[in-house]
Structure formats: structure tokens, C-alpha cells
Amino acid sequence: MNPGIVYVTLSAYGHAGPWAERRGFDSLVQTATGFNHAEGEAAGVNGPKELPAQMLDHATGYFMAFGAMMARARQAREGGSWHVRVSLAQTGRWLWNLGRLEDGLKTADLPGDAVKPFVEELPSGFGALHSVKPSAALSKTM
């Protein structure tokens, strides 16, 4: 490994074990780890059901960014190179162990007015673009 580098790797099912070399993506890992079956049970359907979002992709991306930042902080203190390893399956295990909200599917949708303060409208070549506003503004990034 190049000295002084922070290296982040992602795998579908983990970096060790019999499935370490298998390729995969969020939907496959959701199915292989039982999330789709649990979603079907919660929704009252007979069989698996897809989740409403690619939660493993999103959460694992946050873990990758956090791991890279922590490795850089450690590198600033101690020097050296650091390797951060994350996997979709381990993220799924972590999320699974958080537990489930009873009647979580019965939660009412937010009305559009409730999110309006957090959305901005920007002009684009395709017309008005609506996006979530930045969560913070830093003096050096403006």
C-alpha cells in the first residue's frame, strides 16, 4: 500500500468467509440477509417484498465516509496508511440489530407543507429543480 494513503474498500457480503468474493448490490444483499422476507411479513404479504429504499447502499456510503474521516484523523495523529473495510451485509446486520418499530408501516406520510422549509427550488435546463437544502453552511465552502 502507498505510504500515507487512506484506502476504503466496499464489498457486498464481507471481506472474509465463503461469500467474500461474491459480487452483489443492495437488492441482492437485502434478499440474501432476510430483509425482503421481513418486509413482506411486516406488510402482511405472503412472500418477500422490496424495501422502499436502497437502505444498505445509503447507510454503507455514510459508513464509508465516516470511516475515511476517522482514518484521516488517526493519520493526522499517528501517521501511516489506513485501510477501512465496509460491506453491505455488515451494514445490514447493524441495522437489523437496531430492532424494528411496531406498526412502522402504519406511520402517516408527512404533508408537503411539513418539508417545504427544507426544500429549495433551482433553475435547470429541464425546468425548476427541487432539492433538499444543504444541512449546514460552512464559511470556507460558500
PLM ranges: what are they?
Residues 1-139:
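Active-site-adjacent "lid/gating" segments in soluble enzymes
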